[in-house]
């Protein structure tokens, strides 16, 4: 029986014979059965990442591929140069003793060197292993050991010192460390600058590298992505060559990224490449369809992203909800400072924009004459101010986008399509874009993939399960964890609860692991309640519902604050929107401390008023928020409360603020 015939039917069950590959493996050198369809999408010929790269060079060789800022100018590499420099890096990695299916750990902000190290690792027969720049030394050590990392590529001395603080006996697999930015401050054997590292491979003949490349198979592991560990310890998600190459092609088709001679799409890389969403959008799709990737500055998320966007003017853009929320805040602050006439024009244009774009979303194309005026007066100016004036496709991913933010941008002629998925399905499972769009929906299933709602209730709500060539190989070294998410028929269980409408649009309603079960046995999904609180109370930055096994629900709140431009840490000072909110109420507060010190009565009353509105919409008494507390500091990645894509780390927050939570239930 061929692999195709075995894998085409998701109801067939696992292949349990030892002679043939199974649908899953937990070994880094394992091979899996590819889930090819009989025909159509999902039936494409499997290819390795080196084969994809070679095809890209043949098609786009002279086009620019990567661009990085050097002073005031951008240095670029063409696709041909990109491939050559990756081969050079691969030979250097072989020279350093990189073993087959062992990791190359990359620790630092997005850069040309990050991507070259990733591709170099794969060409050399190793595994690309991204390590979050915000990881502690202990977290780095866990990844190094688990992924058998042979070579570490670090950004700067700060990251180097983090690695050097790990006892050598905890890094026995590491043979060399390379620093790719800033001069080396240390001098020891097996420690190299990027320039010296790139010359090491000159002694390795090209034919030796070619043999390694030719020996690779599409059903073998190429990339390990570590889950950010919002619950429990991180797991190494093994993605095969086919996972990457097929998903990149399927996603590019879905979002209509097609290379046209003489035109080139562009993207700005700023979300951590250790995360699958950024890696797919910034590395793999660009190789597949010839996109030019610009690298933002390391402080992009601390305020400089907008300047890069204004300079580069990308044609498609992916933001996590927190990025879109920050953009929304900026627009609101600018409008608040404008004249009354401009405020009226903005409000009029928004009202018209929401009406027209909602109709467009439903397939109606009748555009009123005054829409052009709204576009000229408001929409074009907003896009230009954000650096998105050349952008044809806008996305949000990693966590749900609120209705408030989605409709705000829709009203400004910026329809944000949501991408739903997980690391374990190579990133996307459903996609919502300008041609497949509904507010609050995650769109439709990626062409060539299958969706199932497991254990549906009477309302058609069940656990989202996935099947297709995007489904991962398994968790590295964790068979029990792998079999928890892959059932006996090979379906990937997401842990997310969702429903499909009559047009097959998927809506996610909650996450099984995040559900709060009250003392009375009620199941409460926190995200809809938290989202509503943030919508109704403009001063709130983060809201986290608590009350598992408790008699009633309580909530932790943080206020919108300025952030330190250097560290990214939230400051005590309120941001402009929060200060305007206070002034509107008659409060003189300009810091969080000002509000907490005197339990500012007008601010507390306004927050309680917003909570009351949320409670009025509760489906039952058990869904109402009884108590709440304002924390002294906003949540942040640096503070540990948020993951790398700004998701709430609920377990950690619950532990960190245990005293405050206990106090709400004891008082």
From Swiss-Prot:
Give the source's domain of life in one word. Eukaryota
* Assigned EC number: 6.2.1.3, 6.2.1.15
Query: Can you cite an annotated GO cellular component?
Result: cytosol
Q: What is its main location?
A: cytoplasm
Q: Source species, please? A: Rattus norvegicus (Rat)
**Where along the chain is ATP bound?**
227-235, 418-423, 496, 511, 624
What name appears for this protein in its UniProt entry? Long-chain-fatty-acid--CoA ligase ACSBG2
Per the entry, what this protein does is: Catalyzes the conversion of fatty acids such as long chain and very long-chain fatty acids to their active form acyl-CoAs for both synthesis of cellular lipids, and degradation via beta-oxidation. Can activate diverse saturated, monosaturated and polyunsaturated fatty acids. Has increased ability to activate oleic and linoleic acid. May play a role in spermatogenesis.
PROSITE patterns, sorted: AMP_BINDING
Catalysed transformations (reactions): a long-chain fatty acid + ATP + CoA = a long-chain fatty acyl-CoA + AMP + diphosphate; (5Z,8Z,11Z,14Z)-eicosatetraenoate + ATP + CoA = (5Z,8Z,11Z,14Z)-eicosatetraenoyl-CoA + AMP + diphosphate; hexadecanoate + ATP + CoA = hexadecanoyl-CoA + AMP + diphosphate; (9Z)-octadecenoate + ATP + CoA = (9Z)-octadecenoyl-CoA + AMP + diphosphate
BP-aspect Gene Ontology terms: cell differentiation; fatty acid metabolic process; long-chain fatty acid biosynthetic process; spermatogenesis
Specify the protein's topology with respect to the membrane: Peripheral membrane protein
Where is the protein situated, by its record's location annotation?
Answer: Cytoplasm; Membrane
Q: Where is this region: Disordered?
A: 1-20
Q: Which family does it belong to?
A: Belongs to the ATP-dependent AMP-binding enzyme family. Bubblegum subfamily.
Query: What are the Basic and acidic residues biased-composition ranges?
Result: 1-14
Q: Which UniProt keywords apply?
A: ATP-binding, Cytoplasm, Developmental protein, Differentiation, Fatty acid metabolism, Ligase, Lipid metabolism, Membrane, Nucleotide-binding, Spermatogenesis
Question: What GO molecular functions are on record for this protein?
Answer: arachidonate-CoA ligase activity; ATP binding; fatty acyl-CoA hydrolase activity; long-chain fatty acid-CoA ligase activity
